[in-house]
A protein has these predicted regions:
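N-terminal Sec-pathway targeting helices
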Residues: 1-17, 24, 28
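Catalytic glycan-binding domains that act on GlcNAc-containing polysaccharides
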Residues: 27-180
Length: 180
């Protein structure tokens, strides 16, 4: 009789746990649905995950090897992947380059063919990375050597033909890129 009593309470406990788990799942679903409805479009993923998603999207679109895209993001703003919760790529360099891929406004305007504001370049992650990948694609079509392309990336596209071959920081950037 004792065994049957223990078995009964054991089965009862399992049933209660299952019902509680189902209730928690339902509450979680309702909460997510409520938040999505209430905050329509204002819920965002962590900044580092947004950068990751944009790099994945545009490196595929423009056929940029992922290791190139991620190395440049690391060299420009120390981006270390989608789980780098401390990452904050909304940076402006001393030269005026903006965002996670450090794009100069003049370069952005040249690559996209329309005026991009500094604010857009800094805060619109997707646009910043799209311009970056488009620039890398254009440079690779022109030079066909990723080490050279990555060095030229650092100077900005309009300046490539004028002084990139002689730029000391360009040589330093190329050597840092190759080491990563």
């Amino acid at each position: 009789m004792v065994k049957n009593g223990v078995r009964f309470f054991y089965i009862l406990a399992i049933g209660i746990v299952i019902i509680a788990a189902q209730n928690l799942v339902n509450i979680a679903k309702e909460t997510v649905e409520y938040n999505l409805e209430t905050h329509k479009g204002t819920i965002t993923s962590p900044y580092s995950l947004q950068v990751y998603n944009s790099i994945e999207k545009y490196s595929n679109k423009y056929k940029i090897p992922k290791y190139i895209a991620y190395n440049i993001a690391f060299l420009e703003t120390r981006y270390q992947g989608p789980f780098d919760w401390d990452y904050h790529g909304k940076l402006t360099s001393f030269a005026g380059a903006k965002g996670p891929m450090q794009i100069m406004p003049a370069t952005a305007n040249y690559i996209i063919g329309k005026n991009i504001t500094k604010n857009e370049l800094l805060h619109n992650i997707d646009l910043n990375i799209k311009i970056s990948m488009k620039l890398l694609h254009k440079l690779h079509n022109q030079y066909d050597d990723w080490a050279v392309v990555c060095g030229y990336y650092n100077t900005g596209y309009p300046q490539v033909n004028s002084y990139a071959r002689y730029c000391a920081s360009n040589k330093n950037y190329k050597s840092r890129w190759v080491s990563y």
